[in-house]
């Protein structure tokens, strides 16, 4: 195979895979989905966020790793909406993360201001709830947010 790196101007990993599919006529989508899913190594998204001290920018990253679960979701249009949940749940096992997870970690590490995180978030209300201490049924973000002395992402 060949290593292909490309840039697409999209807002997140889900929009990226949808954009890739939209490059083909609709009558070819059922043929393209399996090909795309088996050939996709991963998607890395990047948003540059102003630092808390205003001296530069720090990357907030979104990572979707190509694996069996990703392939399954990419092949089935009904499961495409589950990709974001998989990215949150697969953080410790696969190294995946959403933009919002990365933004929250940057806030908690003191790298960026909460206001900047909310302005750049895909789902700002989820970050507000998390910062207010309101938890969901599973606290997926806590499994990813680095503790003092550890880091999942170089910042």
Q: PLM features: residue spans?
A:
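Short, flexible helix-loop junctions that flank or precede catalytic/ligand sites
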Residues: 2-155
């Amino acid at each position: 195979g060949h290593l292909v790196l490309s840039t697409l101007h999209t807002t997140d990993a889900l929009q990226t895979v949808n954009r890739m599919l939209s490059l083909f006529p609709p009558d070819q989508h059922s043929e393209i989905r399996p090909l795309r899913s088996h050939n996709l190594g991963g998607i890395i998204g990047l948003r540059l966020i102003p630092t808390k001290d205003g001296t530069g920018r720090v990357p907030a990253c979104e990572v979707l790793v190509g694996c069996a679960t990703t392939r399954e979701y990419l092949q089935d249009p009904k499961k495409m909406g589950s990709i974001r949940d998989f990215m949150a749940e697969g953080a410790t096992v696969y190294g995946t993360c959403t933009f919002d997870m990365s933004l929250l970690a940057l806030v908690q590490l003191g790298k960026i201001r909460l206001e900047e995180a909310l302005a750049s978030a895909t789902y700002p209300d989820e970050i507000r709830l998390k910062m207010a201490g309101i938890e969901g049924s599973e606290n997926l973000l806590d499994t990813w947010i680095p503790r003092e002395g550890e880091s999942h992402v170089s910042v």
